Amino acid sequence: MIISHKYKFVFIGLPFSASSAISKELHLQYEGAPYLRKHSLYHEFEKVATKNEKDYFVFAVLRNPMEIVVTVYEKMKANSKGNFTNPDLFSENGGHITKKHREKFNFIHDNKASFQEYFLNFFIMPFDNFSSLTLDNCDFVIRYENIADDYILALEKSGVSNPKPLPVANKTAGKKKDLSLYYSNEIKDRTIKVFGPFLSKYNYPFLESWGEVKVPLSSKLQFMILGFLRKVNQKYFKKLPNTTEIKGTIYGDMQRGKLN
């Protein structure tokens, strides 16, 4: 989470939604300061914010979950930075790599699992993430697929005059994956059950080649019930990790005043 007292805005960084790149730019260009954890949610901010801070302009980024799941799979498969095998990053040591992450990582590598095998093994219930716990409290939501323009618009709405373009926006747009290469007909029915309620809620389409898609009522009901329980758990029972990120990360260096 980033807060700027000069421009009176709060940026809520959601995972796998360019949060590091945006946080860095807000810090360097708009006097944005790290606030709580990198991925702290609005209800956490609300508990500690002053009355004045609660009036700040709040924004976040929403990304298609079908893209997020592919991105996570590819990151685990490549493990290019060694994150999933670095004990310093494990959640029990204060990092962000959970036991569930490692279970998925091991499944992919032990079985040389394709995306379809990975998806069928781990994605059964309707998908939901921190977006549902956050976006209702936002004054503006940047759509990841339109990040370059929406980032500028968010800053303009917060009162920034002539905001600078996000440096990684064009690079991010160029990374867009062909989802049809991952979501094959083999997993079509499961994909609809898993993503249908979330995509409907946030106006995302399924693959065009699939034509008209009908989301099962059972998935919609599960999404609603599990979403409610998740909100209650996050707000009242979830034990939050340390607010200080590890050294060498963008947010961790920002917290230590060492980001240039």
Residue positions per predicted region:
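Membrane-interface amphipathic segments in extracytoplasmic regions
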Residues: 1-260
